[in-house]
Amino acid sequence: NANNNLPQPDQVAQLVEKQNIQYLRIYDSNPKVLMAFSNTTIELMVGVRNADLSAFQSQSYVDSWLRNSILPYYPATNITHITVGVEMVDSLDDATNLVVPAMRNVVSALKTANLQDRIKFSTPLSSAVLSPSYPPSEGVFSSSYENVLRPLLDFLEENQSPFMVDLYPFYAMNNGDSSLDYVLFKSSSSIFVDGNTGLSCNNIFDAQLDVLHFALAHRNFSRMKIIVTETGWPTRGSPYASIDNAQTYNTNLIRHVMDGPGTPAWPHEELVVYIFSLFNENLKQGPETERNFGIFYPDMTSVYNLVFPDKGGRSWCIASSQALDSDLQY
C-alpha cells in the first residue's frame, strides 16, 4: 500500500477528466476505481499484481477473476488493456516463469468472453532486459533474460500484443551517464549520429526506445507495437530531482509525443507513453525519489503545472498510484 492519503476514486475521475487525460493506467482492478470511471471517456489499463501471479496459474481462478472483477464494469468502464505483473521478468527468480502462463490464462478467459480483440494484454518490463547498447542500431536483449524473453516474445507476437516497457531517462542522468539537456529534450542539435544507420538523435528517450526497436527487429519482431507504460521525473530526493526538471521533462515529453513523428529509426510509429505518476506516494519504500514522481499532491493541487493538450484527437496517458493495492483504505 503505497499511499494512505489519496482522494476518493470519484474525485480522481473528475480530476483526470478535467485535466484532459484520456488514458489511465492503474495497477490492479479495484472495484471502487473501476466504478468511478464508468460512463467516462477515459480508457483504462488495469493490472494484475505480482502477488496474484501464483493464483493466476489456475484457469478457473482467472475465469472467476474476469467474471467478478472486470466484466461487471465493462463496457461502461472502458477497459482497453490488462497488464499481467509489473517488471516481473527483471527479477530473474522463479516468479518470472509465472508471467507467460498467467497471460495464457487471461487470453483464454478473454476468448471465452469474446473480448480478446477488444481488451489487449501484456506485461510491463523495465529497460534492464536490454543490454547497454550504443549506438541504438546495435540494440539487443540481455542474454540473462533469454529463458523468459523467448517464450514471452513468441506469446506477444502470436496474440498481436504490445511490448510494454518502463523507461526512465532520469536514472541515466542520476548515474551520471548523460547531459541534462539530452535527457530533458532540450538539445536543439543532434547529440550523436548512429554510424551504422546515419540517423541522428537529440534526446535519450528516443535513443532508449530505438535500442528496444532494434532489439526487437534483430529477433524478427520489428512490427511489434511498443507502449511505454511508465516514464517520469521525481521532484525531490536527488540533485537532479526538482520541480523545474520534472516540469521540463514531462512538458517536453508531451510536446515530443504530440508533435510526432516517432523515433529516428521508427519515424512512422506513433508513440504511446504513460507518465508516472498522477499522485505522490507517501508510503512507497526505497529512496525519497520513489515517493515524489507525482504531478499532483493527494489534495489534488498541482505539484507543478503540466498541460495535457488535446490535439487532433490525440490525448494523454497517465499512470496512477491510485490503485497500487486493492486494499487501499478510503
Q: Model-found features: residue ranges?
A:
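Soluble non-cytosolic domains of exported or imported proteins
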Residues: 6, 60, 93-100, 199, ...
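Conserved residues at the C-terminal ends of beta-strands
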Residues: 24-27, 85, 166, 276
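Substrate-binding and catalytic surfaces of secreted/luminal carbohydrate-active proteins
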Residues: 13, 104-108, 117-123, 129-130, ...
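Boundary/entry segment of secreted carbohydrate-active catalytic domains
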Residues: 1-23
